[in-house]
Amino acid sequence: ISSRNAKDFYNLMDVYLDAVFNPRLLTDKRVFLQEGTRREIFNKDDEIQYQGVVYNEMKGAMSSSEEFIYQAMQEEMYPGNYPAFNSGGDPYEIIKLTYDELLDYYKRHYHPSNSFTVLYGDGDVDEELEHLDEFLSAYEYKEIPNKIGMTLAKDSKNFIERAYPNDVSDKHNYAYSFITGDIDNTRDSIMTEFLSKYLSYFSNSPLKKKIQEMGIASDLLSYSNYGYGNGNFTDINMILKDADSGKADIFKDAVEEELENIKAGRINGDIYDSALNLMDFTLKEFANTATKGIALALKAVAMWLFDKSPATAFVYNATLEELKKDQSTFINFVKDVHKDPKLIDFYPVKDFYKDRDEAERKALDEYKANLSDEELEALIKENEDLKAMQEAGDSKEALASIPTLKLSDLPRDIEKLPLEKISDSAYYSKEDSKICYLNLFFDISHIAEEDYVKVANLVDLLADIKTEKSSREKLETDIFKTTGAINFAASVVKNYKNGKLTPFVQCSAKFTKDKAVSAMKLIDEIIKYSDPSDEKVLKMNVLESVSDFDNNVLNIAPAIAMDVAKAQSLEKERLTLKLHGIEKFIHLKELKANFDELKDEEIKDYKRLMKTMFRKDGFISHYSFECRIAELDKAIAELEASLESIDAP
């Protein structure tokens, strides 16, 4: 929980503590039937269906290929240990859980003695602890056996074949994984994340580039479990997406060749420096969000839960300095940890859950057939009672028990952002940060609406394609040696004073003070000299974007439907669908399906848009830092002055 109002924070604390340690679940089975799972039927002639909030959520989650593959990788990496089990709940197992079993589990584990509490912020810590004590002191401490040990399997298979659900593609996915160290050894964690970034984060990363040149997959993903871990261990996982069958050995050889290059000291210095700079940014600005305290708490608790020091999660400077000093630390780390890798071939199966669904249907039909008339009526009444509870809402007494704020508890004055006007188009805000965050906004309302989907695709390419001055590889290296990132996006902004809608292309960058001018030079190069004519890069971008969308569409389908519905009556949402909504992906899927026929026209349009997107009219800049940066102010002004007006040819 979090709040910027002290009284509201204490109210939320009371509600949360009460909900966790005195849940209605303990006395009302209908809560279990609603939130967990139930056999639903309202008419005796109907079929019984499984329903429930968590049950339906996990049905959706496990229909995602990516979610399934991740869970399967955990099962193969840590067989018999807790990561191998789906913490959200396998929907085919959720239906086996009974109300009495859940109550027994709750009573054994949900106790203050078995809880971990983190407070963060500028509140009065003594007062907050006293407030907690008022609630927790009502409980007697008790020992709860809760240690979660992990034992790695010996002599487990190194090559595994597993089916995964995919109704739309015949492509395989391949995973190459190995354990890299202990989660409470910060050095192991940071080194693992650094290895992941070095191998595949950048388009010119050794393994990523090798896979792209081989042309055997739509993308290569690499990630570590840095910061959150799997109990006792850190690991690294590389996934070859959407490849043909029979590519397992080719993928394995490619990964191991690059790992052997590292062990032999054959390291790309530019990529090494870029990965190091990116790691530096990632660690220094961790959880730089409005809910920073919650993010920090989750990271600390990930250690604390397994009897590790929570402070361990935030110690990183020493390892970064080792990496900056020379490459030997990195080389020796890879030599030490590259052992016993797992290679998994995930082959697609259509109607993957068909047998389990049919068995579930058969079991429900048999269950109903074995019910007496009285038992069936009781089941129908149980569902009717639940529906009545859901429709009735909370009673006046229940609503009155919710703590509220009085008007006098709220500040009378609206907090003003510390915004300083530099010029008619340039703004600065003071922020206690060693990293400068810059945003440049380019008004594109002069561009025809039918071009918006192509604007959306083009901005995805910017900073990832060559320019007239630099190759794609050199530009990327320069970006990440100079900044934490330079990104482009398209969006629609509403002026709430006059209701006017303005579509913008936004350039966002982050860098340290000493790199401000260099960062602006890179931005200038990208917006003025980018060359979108590389067919290979365009096709790769299209394949990656469509693959990501297809893998996530089931999870985001409700949001897509909501956006489309709102777009029927709201102008802002209608335009947003084109700039970064479903219409953008419809265009990408068409481009993928007919790439050879459409590529020339697409590139021609990109070149046309590059000449008109970045104009002076409506340009706005803003940056936040601990102080004004004179050199940056000057560079922004020079960039604006160099831009052409909309009416320029």
Predicted regions located by residue number:
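Segments forming glycine/polar-rich beta-alpha architectures that bind adenosine-containing cofactors
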Residues: 312-463, 472, 618, 622-636, ...
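Non-catalytic, conformational "gating/processing" segments within enzyme and secreted inhibitor domains
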Residues: 51, 100-135, 563, 573-584, ...
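An aromatic/glycine/proline-enriched structural segment found at the starts
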Residues: 116-172, 286, 615, 620-649
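Generic recognition of flexible, low-complexity loop/linker segments
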Residues: 103-107, 162-164, 222-226, 321-322, ...
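Short helix/loop capping segments that flank catalytic or ligand/cofactor-binding pockets
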Residues: 9-12, 62-63, 105, 127-129, ...
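M16 family metallopeptidases and their MPP-like homologs
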Residues: 1-22, 28-41, 66-92, 114-120, ...
